[in-house]
């Protein structure tokens, strides 16, 4: 397997994962639950400084680990330049997503954009159609409304974002 191909392979918590790997995510989950209990912080943004540091892998595994404890978890892919979540989880590129729900065309279709992974215990809101202005789209009222709607349904919202060095 080539280096480039190997880079995009997802290593997930579960029965096949090494004990230490799974325990590290359980420890992270416990720490976040303690923090959430005192601050009511239920939206967790995952980022990195540069591409290739594993932020999408962390986002997926954190979402699964939180769901394993009985929490309702939605994983939102906001990496609109280079979506890795959809590739990891084999969500078709043409599936509607957050961009479609906030740009006006399919705003009422949030429920249709969500992809339920019952085997993993999580729901994913993929990117959708890649917009010409991704960073501007993240700061809209429609985005705020979408997150408000998700907060009504889910215990945790895990947000996968682009690396800090990529966003302009």
Language-model regions, residue ranges each:
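P-loop NTP-binding module
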Residues: 1-168
């Amino acid at each position: 397997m080539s280096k480039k191909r190997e880079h995009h392979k997802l290593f997930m918590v579960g029965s096949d994962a090494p004990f230490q790997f799974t325990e590290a995510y359980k420890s992270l989950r416990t720490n976040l639950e303690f923090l959430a209990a005192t601050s009511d912080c239920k939206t967790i943004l995952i980022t990195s400084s540069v591409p290739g540091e594993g932020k999408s892998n962390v986002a997926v595994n954190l979402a699964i680990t939180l769901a394993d404890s009985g929490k309702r978890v939605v994983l939102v892919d906001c990496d609109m330049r280079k979506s890795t979540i959809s590739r990891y989880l084999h969500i078709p590129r043409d599936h509607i997503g957050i961009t479609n729900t906030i740009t006006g065309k399919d705003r009422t279709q949030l429920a249709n954009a969500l992809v339920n992974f019952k085997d993993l215990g999580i729901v994913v809101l993929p990117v959708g159609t890649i917009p010409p202005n991704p960073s501007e789209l993240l700061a809209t009222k429609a985005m705020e409304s979408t997150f408000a709607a998700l907060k009504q349904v889910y215990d945790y919202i895990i947000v996968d974002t682009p690396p800090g060095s990529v966003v302009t």
